[in-house]
Swiss-Prot record:
GO cellular component labels: nucleus
Keyword S-adenosyl-L-methionine on entry: no
Composition bias type Low complexity, residue spans: 422-451
Polar residues biased stretches: 186-195
InterPro entries: AP2/ERF_dom, AP2/ERF_dom_sf, DNA-bd_dom_sf
Repeat listed as a keyword: yes
Name of the protein described by the UniProt record: AP2-like ethylene-responsive transcription factor AIL7
Source organism of the structure: Arabidopsis thaliana (Mouse-ear cress)
Database matches in Pfam families: AP2
Family membership noted in the UniProt record: Belongs to the AP2/ERF transcription factor family. AP2 subfamily.
Tissue: Expressed in roots, seedlings, inflorescence, and siliques. Also detected at low levels in leaves.
Organism superkingdom: Eukaryota
Gene name as annotated: AIL7
Length: 498
């Protein structure tokens, strides 16, 4: 039986041959069947001359290797186990030809030039460049020393119990099957110690994949570049809401600090794509006439062409926006008006005014009141160019612009009441003037006591009660005392409050 397996690799000085015995297995292993261990023979490296002499002296003095450096005799030593255990034990009756096939270049004085330039691998484990020497059965002569520095690798892998893998990659044409050892500390991929064919292949694969990905990205950019979100002119699809918006570029004006002449005119948002396209057509016909490029035939807008002749550009654009569903989403025909989902009342709000947020204007009983509140807030924040639900002449623009915040439902109601109270105040002042003209304007000395009204004029600011009313009797003599006035001469103002 062969000795038990260990995790060490055996490096011997004998040729790599196996016993041709069928009844005994020399490569019994506890590893996986797919990974077959191999013996490595004659693994040496070149060193400098100073290091060679020191290594030779140390090896000559050592008790383990003293038998190999016998200068008086050229006897070739027999097989030794440097690590205390081996995979294969060779028979002692090997021929001298086999024993001397690989050891002759190192122990024969005729080949001392090679022996002086070569030392064992275990003398220095930090040798950076690993060199291999042919271990075939042919004689190693001086003519083959020039090829010692070349590295020939065979396609084998030696696995140990650890995660390190030893890679032997390359092609070998010699009969001896020369191997070169390389150690990889990673657990996934073996290290290849060849001329870089595998690394080159991986680099080629990486470059190919990079080129493919870059080509795909370029194709995507080319495909998405210049794509329109709608088949109609002047219509775009909103990326978040999925609704369609219509815009018109007005190149008849230039804003301050703007490089390109013109401005974008918003025509409203629409639930259907064709409605947005028709809104663009109408705006284009209003701006540029019948020469404008439209989405649909101009003959289909005969009725709208008659209506737009009586309106200015701003008025017509405002009417287009009112017909859109950009704000109401079908809940109300008025802009900025929606129905409360719990109360059922109409609420108004305006967007993008308070730090790019919506401003809530309150709830109202009718749609018209909510629409008026929105109009007042729009005029306050956006001036005369604001898009309102009703005509501008319905509101006092100067009063709205000078009003203070907040602009909400209560402020809109107060403003509406203020406008309504202006006319009743003027009529009440005229009524007071008429009452003063009815009073007598004669002097008190010439005044007839009977002509003095028996009452106190009513003033709305002061309330009078019954005890404040009295009859006026002049201070005269008893002979001239007259009878009290009749009931018809006593006056009371009808605007009393009790």
């Amino acid at each position: 039986m062969a000795p038990p397996m260990t995790n060490c690799l055996t490096f011997s000085l004998s040729p790599m041959e196996m016993l041709k015995s069928t009844d005994q297995s020399h490569f019994s292993s506890s590893y996986d069947d797919s990974s077959t261990p191999y013996l490595i023979d004659n693994f040496y490296a070149f060193k400098e001359e100073a290091e060679i002499e020191a290594a030779a002296a140390s090896m000559a003095d050592s008790t383990t290797l003293s038998t190999f450096f016998d200068h008086s005799q050229t006897q070739i030593p027999k097989l030794e186990d440097f690590l205390g255990d081996s995979f294969v034990r060779y028979s002692d009756n090997q021929t001298e030809t086999q024993d001397s096939s690989s050891l002759t270049p190192f122990y024969d004085p005729r080949h001392r030039t090679v022996a002086e330039g070569v030392t064992g691998f275990f003398s220095d484990h930090h040798q950076p460049d690993f060199k291999t020497i042919n271990s075939g059965p042919e004689i190693f002569d001086d003519s083959t020393t020039s090829n010692i520095g070349g590295t020939h690798l065979s396609s084998h892998v030696v696995e140990s119990s650890t995660t390190a893998k030893l890679g032997f990659n390359g092609d070998c044409t010699t009969t001896g099957g020369v191997l070169s050892l390389g150690v990889n500390n990673t657990s996934d991929q073996p290290l290849s110690c060849n001329n870089g064919e595998r690394g080159g292949n991986s680099n080629k694969k990486k470059t190919v994949s990079k080129k493919e990905t870059s080509d795909d990205s370029k194709k995507k950019i080319v495909e998405t570049l210049g794509q329109r979100t709608s088949i109609y002119r002047g219509v775009t699809r909103h990326r978040w809401t999925g609704r369609y918006e219509a815009h018109l570029w007005d190149n008849s004006c230039r804003r301050e600090g703007q490089a390109r002449k013109g401005r974008q005119v918003y025509l409203g948002g629409y639930d259907k794509e064709d409605r947005a396209a028709r809104a663009y057509d109408l705006a284009a016909l209003k701006y540029w006439g019948s020469t404008a490029t439209t989405n649909f035939p101009v003959s289909s807008y005969s009725k709208e062409l008659e209506e737009m002749n009586h309106m200015t550009k701003q008025e017509f654009i405002a009417s287009l926006r009112r017909k859109s569903s950009g704000f109401s989403r079908g809940a109300s025909i008025y802009r900025g008006v929606t129905r409360h989902h719990q109360q059922g009342r109409w609420q108004a709000r305006i967007g993008r005014v308070a730090g790019n947020k919506d401003l809530y204007l309150g709830t109202f009983a009718t749609e018209e009141e909510a629409a008026e509140a929105y109009d007042i807030a729009a005029i306050k924040f956006r001036g005369i160019n604001a898009v309102t639900n009703f005509e501008m002449n319905r509101y006092d623009i100067e009063a709205v612009m000078n009003s203070s915040l907040p602009v909400g439902g209560a402020a809109a109601k107060r403003h509406k009441l203020k406008l309504a109270l202006e006319s009743p105040s003027s009529s009440s002042s005229d009524h007071n003037l008429q009452q003063q003209q009815l009073l007598p304007s004669s002097s008190p000395s010439d005044q007839n006591p009977n002509s003095i009204p028996c009452g106190i004029p009513f003033e709305p600011s002061v309330l009078y009660y019954h005890q404040n009313f009295f009859q006026h009797y002049p201070l005269v003599s008893d002979s001239t005392i007259q009878a009290p006035m009749n009931q018809a001469e006593f006056f009371l103002w009808p605007n009393q409050s009790y």
